[in-house]
Amino acid sequence: RVEDGFLRSRGLGAELVPPLSLVVDDLGIYYDPGRESRLERLIASPLPPGGGARAARLRARILGSGVTKYNLVRDTPELASRIAALRADKPGQPVILIPGQVEDDASIRLGAGKVRTNRALIETARQHSPGAILVYKPHPDVEAGLRPGSVPDAEILADLVWTGADAHSALALADQVWTMTSGLGFEALLDRKSTRLN
């Protein structure tokens, strides 16, 4: 199997921006829990000498540079102030980032649990954390109208719909991430954010 790499490109695959990295797996693919993948085997294997230090340096470099899967343009002074206002309205409540996904993506078909749509993910987060500040970030391919997964009433379901935001800025302002199978969940784990898979 071949899939976009975790650090894909500077732009969207749906806009035909070529990938800078690919995952090639001769056994399965990382998002399919029904089959073992080469990545799973590598993770289960002992690290080579110096492997832990190398991984720590790579993690620090990724976080320090702010690179993400798509590396979209950074925004967000206005959005940072909107989050601050929401925090003032709901003191002590966490900001939960909900990354939207392309709903016909193979990762959802093969890797998601009961929650399989962006709308259901927002509703699940609200049900389990009624007082939290829910920030929904549509997937950039969906936002561009290139793939399915739109949530027309997202502004009613979430406290803020964060369009045009890059993953790095979104993670910096969030306390938690709730996802189905989004790579942004992996980026959140790298950043040691509380991450929930649904």
Regions found by a protein language model. Give the residues of each.
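Catalytic-core helical/loop segments in enzymes performing group transfer/polymerization on anionic/lipid-linked
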Residues: 1-198
